[in-house]
Amino acid sequence: MGDDSVIVGRGHRGELIALHNTCRHRGMPVCEGESGHVERWVCPYHQWSYELDGSLRTCGGMNDQLQRADYGLVRAGVAEIGGLVFVWLGSDPEPLGEAATELAAALAPQGLERATVAHQIDYEVGANWKLIWDNNRECWHCHASHPQYVRANFDNAPDNETTRALIARRSSDHARALGVARAVDHGEPGLYPFPSPGRWWSASRTSLAPDFVTESLDGAPVAPLMGEYAEYDVGTLRVRTVPNFWCHASADHVVATRLAPAGPELTRVRVQWLVDREAVAGRDYDPGRLLPFWRVTSEQDWSLCERNHRGVRNPAFVPGPYSLAREQNVIAFADWYLARVADAGQVAKA
């Protein structure tokens, strides 16, 4: 994330460990691979080696008086919640608190601990990361730009009695199928309100349109049921954490999106499709049916964001007003971001 590089792995007992990827000697990264398996970390520069937990193991050529306990790799915070791994870079030893409780409850029926990555696509989007969040936080653009998405969802449906009655009926359908899972808690047109002051996370279950039991092009299942679900028609669970993650979880698959800003003009985006770990491609699911819905929708958004970025770079651009009816969440995101910038300024002054 920016200049921060963090190694996330598991120790010999399976415990999660996060380490800042910089040797305590001269700063060389000790891990340069995307993924893999090692018995210890070895700096490629002067061969200092570290145990998986970051403790310094060897440092040949150094003074015998060196206190090895003082020169382990610096730890970052890490925790697993409902199958998602969260890493934080600040000094707060455990900032999750209420978020951990809420997210764990929402994610419990999805069974992400028993999921596997069926497919992954890495994108380089020529847009500032904040423009990507602006795009994510409103669906005013959806009818013009996401014909596949609006067929499946109520995010941009008109707010009238007909729509509300339809959503109520679909919510009732989902409630019958949910069983032990969390019930629909966003039963109205439009997007769930997020973010809000002091809350960098949210989780909500939203109804799908009639004839859709999953987010696929035709609404039909694309993979075996995940987790605790006994039926497909459970709507979608949506999880969001600013500044860099969101996911849509249907009963049979999850699509997770992670942002990594690479400068003011570029954002690296990773999109992953997850299914139950027992599911086998070609036997239990067809990637040709699993991928298109969110691949098409995501790439439509990346195109919008890149074009928007070019427009705001125009010297003649002056920001216009937000729509209070359609862009409330964009306003909320701007407020969240400005508050974080102000907080950082206060910390710097201290």
For each predicted feature, which ranges?
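C-terminal catalytic domain of Rieske-type non-heme iron oxygenases
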Residues: E15, A79, L84-A350
